[in-house]
Amino acid sequence: LKNSSLLPHVNAGTLTKEEINKLKPVTASMGMMLENTSRRLTKKGMPHYACPDKVPIQRIRTMDNMGILRIPFTTGILVGIGETWQERIETLQAIQNSHLKFGHIQEVIVQNFVPKQDIKMKFYPKPKHNDFLKTIALARLILSPDISIQAPPNLSLEHPEYLKVGLNDWGGISPITKDFINPENKWPIIKDLNNASKLMGYSLKERLTVYPKFQNEKDGFLHQHIRTKMELLSCDNGLAKEQYIQ
């Protein structure tokens, strides 16, 4: 905050209220993938077995605490790890229920599972493209209109089709750094992504890590340290003052 123009976004997994409060003065927004609310997926032989940080009730509690403490929040669902359609629906409903109570969720990421060589599920198949499109559409139908729907454009060459079924945000795409979660999948070139979006009737606009609706001083979503910095970086409409694509 002192030495750069960056606005920190923290993704630290499950956090207590005390930890969230400690981070708020130096954090613009926070995030944590809910992934799935199914207890079945935590049983032996399933993807979340022996992962105490991924016990659904712990993640739901963190998500709710973010709302109680007025944190602009990002969460999401992981698609293709052995979950059923009913479990996908219940996960999206849990996110919606939290947002209805606290109004703090900025965006929901619909992320497709990608097998990696160093994990136990390395031979597990990727989710089918049509199933993934249906899940994005499902998210758009279940979640409030003020929640953005996001999906990573670097995990599928068919990503422009996401715009047909409800996606309205591509997430963070860097021309400088790699995707540290999926380093084997390069970010698309931003101008190419803009051209692909234009073919679908859209154009890219650069935003800050805090969406415009959460920048209202009266709502208490931002600490004054963050607000002061954000005012230097945002336009009157709340988007980034400097746009990568003019």
Residue spans of the language-model regions?
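Conserved phosphate-coordination/catalytic loops
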Residues: 53, 57, 86, 126, ...
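Short histidine/acidic/glycine/proline-rich micro-motifs that form metal-
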Residues: 79-82, 178-180
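Short Asp/Glu-rich motifs
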Residues: 19-20, 41-43, 84-86, 181-183, ...
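Core AdoMet radical
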Residues: 1-66, 72-75, 79-81, 99-111, ...
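Auxiliary Fe-S-binding modules of radical SAM enzymes
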Residues: 3-4, 89-246
